[in-house]
Amino acid sequence: MREVVLDTETTGLSPKNGDRLVEIGCVELENHVPTGEVFHCYINPERDMPAEAEAVHGLTAEFLADKPVFSEVASSFLEFVGSSPLVIHNSAFDLGFLNSELEALGKCNIPNSQAIDTVSLARSKYPGAPASLDALCRRFSIDNSRRSKHGALLDAELLAEVYLELRGGKQPGLGLTEGKAIKSNPEIELHSAKRPPRAHSPTKEELIAHSALVKKLQNPLWNRQG
């Protein structure tokens, strides 16, 4: 099953107040495992960058000045996500911004039903525990040392690892689909437990029971002729 992990960065907290998207990052999953296919773009928000937002993601107005506006990336973004379920951490926030941008272009909204909210998943699985991305990385021992600031693609990559754990953890060998190799697929090692040697000879009762069982066998292998 194809899913897309998605994250965005913005100029603020509310598109209703004029805030805009500045970065989109997506990671493709197949059976909850990253395939290596990603979508990533920076976006010129056509407005200033508040200091509070810049402190979160480090993206400056100068850096974004020569980047494409949303209308130039909308079609390629929609083509990448398609109708696949979207795995999002606090989906109301990201979908709010995405749908605001899509509406401005006269395009259809992404329905809430298409989103899988990992905040809700985490709170359902671990009631009362912190559900931030950093907190979940710590819970699952996922290395987030690169995350000195927020970044849409980096956060989507981390969320992909968190989502896999929320869905039950890594299962080597699963997630391969015909015609597509999933990266980071470790070899499966099979181990069987060794039984300790029997410390005593069979009893008389056990020998009788074994003899009776053998007599019931129809054409046992050891009685067959070459």
What label would you give each PLM region?
Residues 117:
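A structured binding-face within diverse protein domains that lines the active/interaction site
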Residues 74, 130-133, 207-210:
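Alpha-helix initiation and N-capping motif
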Residues 127, 150-153, 201-204:
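Short, well-ordered coil↔helix boundary/capping segments
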Residues 85-88, 97, 101-102, 132-191:
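Acidic, Mg2+-coordinating catalytic module of metal-dependent nucleases/exonucleases
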Residues 165-226:
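Acidic two-metal-ion nuclease catalytic site recognized across multiple nuclease folds
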Residues 1-113, 123-127, 135-149:
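Conserved non-catalytic scaffold segment of RNase H-like nuclease domains
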